[in-house]
């Protein structure tokens, strides 16, 4: 039977507490705690020692291969630049920006110019017809971009397993939810848990994933601040509604270059 509990989460840094507090002990912000109800399914019983279920194996640095694996060329000079020379296989990239600034269009335009890569574009906000209309306005030379409209993380993994893509796009992380958490999509807990699960998937399969995320009125990524520390790279898409210019600003964690 699922266990249910109530926690309070800081909207600024993601710190949680069993009770509401006025000042966050982690980041020092005032009145940032909101209530979240979490229901987690019971995990499968494991041996007390854990030895029988261990899948990882310690190895020496000399036994590790793939250290010089080339980055994926995004066929966009500016995007390659802010990514440090291209997309790192197995990396998790967060692209943030104001709603309507052009995040989805930028990503769709980019993946449609990757003729040698199979891309799975997961849309949780727009229908397949809406994406088709957007794509028709973009000159492209790729027909190997698969579109699926889905918001369940478990179903997303099924689609990935069946299609085996070279690159996964999730638009947007605020629309995705996992069945193991009884909370609405976009909540602090859902965003954090889904992002952590996607990061684990990216590392285990060496599949790069680009998450699209919205920013709030304060100019930060919507969801817990800890989301920016889960991903390998944060790209923030900035601009002005009165001009056509768009400026990609990059913040890259050291983990992306390991």
Write out the residue ranges for each language-model feature.
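Detector for small/aliphatic-rich hydrophobic stretches
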Residues: 2-5, 16-93, 113, 117-121
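Conserved, well-folded catalytic cores of nucleic-acid-processing
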Residues: 16, 30-33, 85-86, 113-114, ...
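Short gly/ser/thr-rich secondary-structure transition/capping motifs
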Residues: 73-79, 147-151, 217
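Conserved inter-motif catalytic segment of the P-loop NTP-binding fold
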Residues: 90, 98-101, 108-197
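Conserved P-loop NTPase nucleotide-binding/switch module
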Residues: 167-248
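Conserved small/polar residues in nucleotide/adenosyl-binding loops
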Residues: 252-258
